[in-house]
Amino acid sequence: MTTGEVPDLLAFDDAFAQDRHNRYARMREEPVQRIRTVNGLDAWLITRYEDVKQALLDPRIAKDFGRTQQIIEKRLADAERRPGFSPDLGPHMLNTDPPDHTRLRKLVVKAFTARRVEGLRPRIEQITDDLLDRLAGRSEVDLIDEFAFPLPITVISELMGVEDSRRDDFRSWTNVLVDGSQPEAQAQASVAMVEYLTELIAKKRTEPGDDLLTALLEAVEDGDRLSEGELIAMVFLLLVAGHETTVNLIGNCVLSLLGNPDQLAALRNDPSLLPGAIEETLRYESPVANGTFRHTAEAVRFGDVVIPEGELVWVALGAANRDGERFEDPDRFDITRETTGHVAFGHGIHFCVGAALARLEAQIAVGRLLERFPDLRMAASPDDLRWRFSVLMRGLEKLPVRPGA
């Protein structure tokens, strides 16, 4: 790369999604560098493990949706582009720092305690078994479409108190929103999502229940601190993050196991290794590849590189989790590996509030799938599988499998 050259992720396009780990390996050679994102925005990408952890903890690399949005809109205007993502979906706890982050997170964290999550186990097992019943006797199925997606969307919908009758629409909107390369389609999906959430909230006001959405509404009604805009953004975050990460985690885990027969055999011989298989998947094929945008509130130094004030910053979680300085033989899938410290769910105050739920869903899903179908195997060559084109997410478009008898 010549001096001053800005790597252009748009030029990589779909090839980047299909070859992400090799691209990240090359980027880690220059671990803090300026890049051009898929929508033409210049930003800084941080790829090494220690730098990523530093960035996730440094308050100078801020989550302030209003300020970040100003930077984005200014740069897009300078480039004669327009943003696709609706600002109505942005002011949630993932895009804010304290004190707003503290009060927003406080409203939902009690719904995701270890005790509350464990209480969901029987229902998650029931949903899982019902889905597996539908796979039995089939010669070939798409495991993403018929298992990895419907399980978490059903769980989060029930937790939130939301009917999942429009889940296909919701999935379509989410796919566009996490893509980022289609600003016009993203704008349309944003409008549709805001309209859907507004209707959803209005209906829940008249038909409250024993669910998380009602709890959030009552907090607003009781004079707590959620504005209408914050409520829409919070519900958006919980519904999207509450299923998207887990869809990818389940799919990536099954793919990694089927692609590494020795590890699959080890797990079948010793089911107590299942939690380790989930953690290794989180490291090896991190379902969230990059965090959402941050910005520098002041200049920040990483080694010899100084990121000036007012710059957009991305932390590459997936790249950090394949850093050989932190994980020995990082490109090997090993379910007995000590994975403590991976950053698949983030680090610091923005650590994923739903991590325990995602882990539980994945353990139940993968464990019961392998138990139910001992002859489960791939129905396509690994070279024929395609990764979704998303700068944020790492997940397959489809995962064809043959369940067996």
Curated annotation (Swiss-Prot):
EC number annotated for this UniProt entry: 1.14.-.-
Cofactors demanded by this protein: heme
The gene coding this protein: cyp107B1
UniProt keyword Thylakoid present: no
UniProt-annotated location(s): Cytoplasm
Function: Not known, probably involved in the catabolism of octane and guaiacol. It displays a weak activity in the O-dealkylation of 7-ethoxycoumarin.
GO cellular component: cytoplasm
Family that this chain belongs to: Belongs to the cytochrome P450 family.
The species this protein was found in: Saccharopolyspora erythraea (strain ATCC 11635 / DSM 40517 / JCM 4748 / NBRC 13426 / NCIMB 8594 / NRRL 2338)
Protein name (Swiss-Prot/TrEMBL): Cytochrome P450 107B1
Enzyme class: oxidoreductase
Residue positions binding heme: 352
InterPro entries: Cyt_P450, Cyt_P450_B, Cyt_P450_CS, Cyt_P450_sf
Annotated keywords: Cytoplasm, Heme, Iron, Metal-binding, Monooxygenase, Oxidoreductase
One Gene Ontology molecular-function label: monooxygenase activity
